[in-house]
């Protein structure tokens, strides 16, 4: 029985709430405006709705000033994100995405930090053809963005293949069961005829006509690997395995990475474990958690609208009590678990049933051909002969998974022929790096990330080598803005773009993803970054204890205070 009456924040709904309310369940005027050839863009109201269909309108910011001088509209283009729970793609689907990127995109694919594909550079008049082709490959872009449950993540851990297979099936079921029920996507992109007369309450029984106050993210981790950063999720499930069998999941609620520069009422937060559920109870837990956010989330101030703020405002125990009240049963006590890292394991790993997995290092998650490295071509050739699957990891890398023994030699030869790398000749720091897209396509970016981090790493590696730390894993993450797509606050070294060439520098996150970082220096450029890291890494090399990770060292050495909760992130 709930002992405290919960309520949503007071305040007038934001304009986005108006747009959703008037959208006729995410239809708006998208069908009409996508036929318009006068402009390559679309009205803002429709762009807000477009997210729920898996796409954002962007423009090439490298060209923005020049086009303004020429009195031309911005170089509008669309980013399209695929819904692909668990990050698993068949070779046939890989080839379709490769082909679409060449025909309609910018010739590259982005492997995201949520285990899916992003295509950039799609023109408005090519969007429908692109989505229809994706649909023909048994994929879709429904709810890949927007105020709904996003792509459900799942551990890619090759060491527990039998558990991965089972957990992956649960991630797919969860993703499908939590989809919006509106037929808007099918009508606009797939030419489905609208069926009239459906009662409103039947259209979206879980989401309702306003959907959620903000995005909602779910991920499933399989200890000891926290590769999906389970504590960064709105709702995290931690697989509990006993005697080689999956018995259920610990449930964690209230995580999220985004914040706003200069606003201490916004902050990253880690999800807290509140109990345990059996696999067959997972959907019920997810659905009821989502309805709590639907009913009590902040619909007035979008920067405070994520579920983490709802949990912090209402109180963890009150939210747990409300969840159990809606479930009609109580969560079991959480089971013991242990994480020891949140990175990937590179190279060949033997799985079960005579299958092998090869994890490829993909810097920045960008699949393209370089002058001296034909990454995209090599993967295309592998996809033509591969009989297993591809797994996109949460660290923007790629696993060529379930390679049969009789195919291993052929796949190995192609890896060798195209020089595809497991990254082991790079520093462990580079292999533990992650960056969001940022410029030139992201409209929120304040500074470079993906295009700049490799160059910065070249210079940091000189310091690493000087101090004998080349094989020391240190997680380093860079984002072009504070929204946190590359989960900057969980990097032992983190950078958030503040202005062109300027970053806030963060230290002190845990190597296993269980502690947030804290700001160390504000608004600094490359020279200061390198100067600070030279001092810090030198001290780490000399003063660290046996097995001590960098994020732990800077706290023990008094260099930075530990962030014990997101609410003291700014302290």
Swiss-Prot record:
Q: Does the keyword Metal-binding apply?
A: yes
Q: Looking at its record, which EC class is this enzyme? A: oxidoreductase
Q: Output one GO BP term.
A: hydrogen sulfide biosynthetic process
Q: What induces it?
A: Up-regulated by sulfate and the transcriptional regulator CysL.
Indicate which residues the UniProt annotation says bind [4Fe-4S] cluster.
436, 442, 481, 485
Q: In which pathway does it act?
A: Sulfur metabolism; hydrogen sulfide biosynthesis; hydrogen sulfide from sulfite (NADPH route): step 1/1
Q: Which GO terms describe its molecular function?
A: 4 iron, 4 sulfur cluster binding; heme binding; metal ion binding; NADP binding; sulfite reductase (NADPH) activity
Which reaction equations make up its catalytic activity?
A: hydrogen sulfide + 3 NADP(+) + 3 H2O = sulfite + 3 NADPH + 4 H(+)
The record's cofactor note says: Binds 1 siroheme per subunit. Binds 1 [4Fe-4S] cluster per subunit.
Q: Which GO terms describe its cellular component?
A: sulfite reductase complex (NADPH)
Any phenotype upon disruption?
Answer: Cells lacking the cysIJ genes are unable to use sulfate, sulfite or butanesulfonate as sole sulfur source, grow poorly with sulfide, but can still grow with thiosulfate, cysteine or methionine.
Q: Which Pfam families match?
A: NIR_SIR, NIR_SIR_ferr
Instruction: Output the SUPFAM superfamilies linked to this UniProt entry.
Output: Nitrite and sulphite reductase 4Fe-4S domain-like, Nitrite/Sulfite reductase N-terminal domain-like
Q: Is 4Fe-4S given among the entry's keywords?
A: yes
Q: Which cofactor does it need?
A: siroheme; [4Fe-4S] cluster
**Which positions does UniProt annotate for siroheme binding?**
485
Query: What UniProt keywords are attached to this protein's entry?
Result: 4Fe-4S, Amino-acid biosynthesis, Cysteine biosynthesis, Heme, Iron, Iron-sulfur, Metal-binding, NADP, Oxidoreductase
EC assignment: the record states 1.8.1.2
Q: What is known about its subunit structure?
A: Alpha(8)-beta(8). The alpha component is a flavoprotein, the beta component is a hemoprotein.
Cited function: Component of the sulfite reductase complex that catalyzes the 6-electron reduction of sulfite to sulfide. This is one of several activities required for the biosynthesis of L-cysteine from sulfate.
Which family does this protein fall into?
Belongs to the nitrite and sulfite reductase 4Fe-4S domain family.
Q: What is this protein called?
A: Sulfite reductase [NADPH] hemoprotein beta-component
Organism of origin: Bacillus subtilis (strain 168)
Native organism taxonomy: Bacteria, Bacillati, Bacillota, Bacilli, Bacillales
